[in-house]
């Protein structure tokens, strides 16, 4: 047994297109086949004082699945993520996962140590796992994955916001976790940097095959990245939706737009206005 809120949700005016040169051959990457479950929530509740935040959450997520959790501010999605990461405990119910599986978490703020150089910031993710030259080599390897190996000896203050989040992603991934919990990690980035980070995250997820759980307010981001989208409303799962689109995904296609509309309809309590 394993053992927050951000900006107000707003509907995007128009989903951004991928930058020139980022499109690739269409590949089908379906949800993982029925198989081993990475973690399960069973009737999980969480209250703070007399205020219920999660109400009877039942959820199974398979190994290698990319799950997006979306909902309005205060709905309980970040609390769910903190319970998964072991940073909080449920009031009632159980969370089951293999105790040998590492879980790491990435936040909206990079939370880098200003007194440590970039490589040492990444090595923090290896505390209790590796140290010395072995830790440095692993840190340099994952920095290479995120495109920042040449900045390993620099200080955090010289990096842009997007580069700092790349370092935070490297720190979360350096120990090769089986589960990566992402709490609105791209929310503070500008639109182009955000798309670049989405592409980077998807590429590394497909390579390392970890289970990803992304909390986001961005419906377009959820459809672009996830195998499956769960909408939380007032502490309950209101929608559990498979995203059966080929990767890489193209914003603005009719299929992409229909999925966005389905999620938005649930979030805003509307009937189906698409005519589909």
Swiss-Prot record:
Major subcellular location class: membrane
Gene3D superfamilies cross-referenced by the UniProt entry: P-loop containing nucleotide triphosphate hydrolases (3.40.50.300)
Gene Ontology molecular function: any one: ATP binding
Top EC class, one word: translocase
Binding site for ATP: 71-78
An example Gene Ontology CC term for this record: plasma membrane
Reactions accelerated catalytically: ATP + H2O + aliphatic sulfonate-[sulfonate-binding protein]Side 1 = ADP + phosphate + aliphatic sulfonateSide 2 + [sulfonate-binding protein]Side 1
EC number of this enzyme: 7.6.2.14
The keyword ATP-binding is annotated on this UniProt entry: yes
Cited InterPro entries: AAA+_ATPase, ABC_transporter-like_ATP-bd, ABC_transporter-like_CS, ABC_transporter_ATP-bind, P-loop_NTPase
Chain ranges passing through the membrane: none
Region called Disordered, residue ranges: 1-21
Stated family: Belongs to the ABC transporter superfamily. Aliphatic sulfonates importer (TC 3.A.1.17.2) family.
Subunit annotation: The complex is composed of two ATP-binding proteins (SsuB), two transmembrane proteins (SsuC) and a solute-binding protein (SsuA).
Function: Part of the ABC transporter complex SsuABC involved in aliphatic sulfonates import. Responsible for energy coupling to the transport system.
Full protein name: Aliphatic sulfonates import ATP-binding protein SsuB 1
Species of origin: Agrobacterium fabrum (strain C58 / ATCC 33970)
Gene designation: ssuB1
């Amino acid at each position: 047994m394993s053992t927050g809120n951000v900006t107000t949700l707003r509907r995007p005016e128009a989903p951004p297109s991928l930058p020139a040169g980022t499109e690739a051959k269409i590949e089908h990457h379906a949800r993982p086949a029925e198989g081993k479950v990475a973690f399960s929530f069973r009737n999980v509740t969480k209250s703070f004082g007399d205020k219920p935040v999660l109400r009877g959450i039942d959820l199974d997520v398979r190994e290698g699945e990319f799950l997006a959790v979306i909902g309005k501010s205060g709905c309980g999605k970040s609390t769910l993520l903190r319970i998964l990461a072991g940073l909080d405990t449920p009031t009632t119910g159980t969370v089951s996962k293999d105790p040998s599986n590492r879980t790491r978490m990435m936040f909206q703020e990079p939370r880098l140590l200003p007194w440590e150089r970039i490589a040492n910031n990444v090595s923090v993710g290896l505390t209790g796992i590796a140290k010395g030259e072995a830790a440095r080599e692993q840190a340099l390897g994952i920095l290479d994955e995120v495109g920042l190996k040449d900045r390993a000896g620099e200080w955090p203050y010289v990096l842009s916001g997007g580069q700092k989040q790349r370092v935070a992603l490297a720190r979360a991934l350096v120990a090769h976790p089986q589960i990566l919990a992402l709490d609105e990690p791209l929310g503070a980035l500008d639109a182009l940097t955000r798309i670049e980070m989405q592409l980077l995250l998807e590429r590394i997820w497909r390579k390392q095959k970890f289970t990803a759980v992304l909390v986001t307010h961005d419906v377009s981001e959820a459809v672009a990245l996830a195998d499956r989208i769960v909408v939380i409303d007032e502490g309950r799962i209101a929608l559990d939706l498979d995203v059966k689109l080929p990767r890489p995904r193209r914003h603005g296609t009719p299929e992409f737009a229909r999925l966005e509309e389905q999620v938005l309809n649930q979030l805003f309590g509307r009937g189906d206005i698409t005519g589909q």
